[in-house]
A protein has these predicted regions:
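N-terminal targeting signals for export/organelle localization
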Residues: 1-2, 17-18, 34-82, 264-285
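Local cysteine-cluster metal-coordination motifs and their immediate loop/turn environment
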Residues: 25-41, 109-113
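C-terminal cap of thioredoxin/glutaredoxin-like
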Residues: 48-49, 106-107, 113-125, 183-285
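A short beta-strand-turn-helix
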Residues: 86-101, 126
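Conserved helix-turn-beta segment immediately C-terminal to the redox Cys motif
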Residues: 118-139
């Protein structure tokens, strides 16, 4: 089987046979088009998700995924019942508040996988100016001794408009998070130290961190980082933070605006923050 816009040239005969079966048997990801993915693409039905779905399944079969794994990825990406409403409230953010794509991340400053994800997510905002917004939510894990203290430090810095400066300092110096270390970072980023320290130790700041944690619990956050893109979980057990995120964002921009997404301004892989190895997945509670 050949479908316009789908490159299957790199597939082996067995892989192409599997892919052909999948796109012939799985329904198009638009309820208004109750036909197979293959028929949807072939007949150019009015479902902008069909061609991306067919291409997603190419990536899945090329990666050696089973039928079950490929279907899980397909439904995670396209099922209409997977989208949740997430209130960003006063959470710190980067990018336009009217961006077509909003990325919400629950993270822990002591989590190595979060440290790895941070520059990748920020790069997405830089690569798509005005189209992507990144929102940070606090979710310190009980297993991390300094996670709660670091989250409070970032909230206290946020109150002085210095959240992202503290965010960067904490991830850059993740191995040094004793109170004296965090106090040094606060001084380095130029906050009013007395006010910052009072806020760092206040109940109001602890409540602010706990509010994000409760919101995370409500959407079943079980580890960090947990990432949602336009209300849909970007499941890091199924999708790679670097290899798949750009395609995901481009499609969401196109679906939201009806216009092709611009190519990123800067090509190339995004380096992990001071990390030589790529972590396998999110930290669990």
């Amino acid at each position: 089987m050949n479908l316009a816009g789908v490159d299957t040239g790199s597939l082996t005969p067995r892989e192409k046979k599997d892919w052909s079966a999948w796109v012939s048997e799985l329904l198009a990801p638009c309820p208004s088009e109750p036909v197979s993915i293959a028929q949807c693409v072939r007949e150019a039905r009015k479902c902008a998700k069909c061609l991306p779905a067919a291409n997603l399944l190419v990536k899945q079969v090329r990666a050696g995924k089973s039928r079950s794994q490929a279907e899980d990825a397909f439904f995670a990406r396209f099922s209409t019942d997977r989208v949740k409403s997430i209130d960003v409230g006063d959470s710190p953010s980067k990018g336009s508040s009217s961006a077509a794509v909003t990325i919400v991340e629950w993270a822990d400053f002591e989590c190595p996988h979060c440290r790895h994800a941070a520059p990748v997510l920020e790069k997405a905002v830089e690569n798509h100016p005005g189209k992507v917004r990144l929102v940070y939510k606090f979710y310190p894990l009980q297993a991390h001794v300094h996670g709660e203290s670091a989250a409070r430090a970032a909230v206290a810095a946020m109150k002085q408009g210095k959240f992202w400066e503290m965010h960067h300092a904490l991830f850059e110096h993740q191995e040094a998070m004793e109170p004296r270390d965090i106090e040094k970072y606060a001084k380095d980023i130029g906050v009013d130290f007395a006010k910052w320290k009072a806020d760092w130790e206040s109940e109001a700041t602890a409540d602010r961190v706990n509010r994000d944690r409760k919101q995370g619990d409500a959407v079943k956050v079980s580890g960090t980082p947990t990432v949602y893109v336009n209300g849909r979980e970007y499941d890091l057990t199924k999708f790679d933070m670097e290899d798949d995120l750009e395609d995901w964002i481009k499609l969401d921009v196109e679906l939201a605006t009806g216009q092709p997404a611009d190519s990123p301004r800067n090509e190339g892989a995004v380096p992990a923050a001071s990390s030589k190895t790529k972590p396998p997945g999110p930290n669990q509670r």
